[in-house]
Amino acid sequence: YKEYYHNAVTYSVSEIILNVQDPVFVLLMKVFTGSKYGFDNFLLFVAFLTLFFKMTSVFRRVENIYLFVFLYSSYYLCVHDYIQVRVSLALALVCIGMYWIPNKKMSLFFIITGCLVHLSTIIPVFVYYVVGRSDNNLRYKRFYYMVPLVLLIPLAFSMGFLSYYRIDRYLDYYNQASDKKGGLLRNMPLLVPALQVIGLIYIYARKKLRQNIFTFEYAISYIGILIFYSCISIPVIAIRIFDISTFFFIVLISRMKCNIYVIFFSLAFALINIRNTLILLGYNIPFFHFGS
């Protein structure tokens, strides 16, 4: 992010638009370049904006806001919002556009801005416009049947049949980061997807909860799992898309009554993500560390 800020300081607005990578994010930084602590002020501003937009957008979408805050804080607040600043801001903009703003034009403006800040948010936006605004259960069923065919594209990337320079760069970045952490990054995230799979199966298996499969949140959680396992050989992309889907999975869980299963699931989710946070921070506590 310091490189982004350097570009914001060095280049003019027109140069940023024409020549700099991720111009929308850099233009947001440009506003803060006039002060001595511009970079720090920008990070504080983004942190406030991200939390405000996310909390505001889901407030009327969940049954138990306390459960949402608990699940959100165990992962996103500690890891995702702190480390992946750009994608977190993009997701916040998309969420406020999809969930909270009633005006269609203004909603579309926030959604498009979010996608321009980080292209990964195109995935939930695609699902939202395909099925998320529909009450037609048949459309959801067709969507679930067709989605695995779409995943042949990321599978082709991960198997080497297709190539793209940013994917190659992501792989280099991930391998370097994982080497610095002694291989921990390769193992760290696998428990959370497994837990999400269990949660989705539980919702489908329970008759009282099965109607939730015909919701946008269930659909994007389903997509996140499929993309994660189909792109596992490109870990940065797999984890990034899955992280986005996990936010909506948390929304889905927060709509349910706090029975013993939801409580157990929430505690397991929090414990696993506290472990992941400790690993990222470099702590090696035997109770939390299950091997490298």
Segments predicted by a language model, with ranges:
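Transmembrane helices and adjacent periplasmic/lumenal helix-loop junctions
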Residues: I112-Y128
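Alpha-helical transmembrane segments and terminal signal-anchor/GPI-anchor hydrophobic tails
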Residues: Y1-Y11, V26, I123-T246, L280-S292
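Short hydrophobic/aromatic helix or loop-helix immediately within or flanking a transmembrane segment
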Residues: E3-Y37
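Multi-pass, polyprenyl lipid-linked donor-dependent membrane glycosyltransferases
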Residues: V69-F70, D81-C95
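Signature aromatic-anchored transmembrane alpha helix within multi-pass, membrane-resident enzymes
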Residues: K141-L149, I260-N276
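Transmembrane-helix signature of polytopic, membrane-embedded enzymes
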Residues: M55-Y75
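Loop-to-helix entry region of an early transmembrane alpha helix in multi-pass inner-membrane enzymes
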Residues: P23, S35-T50
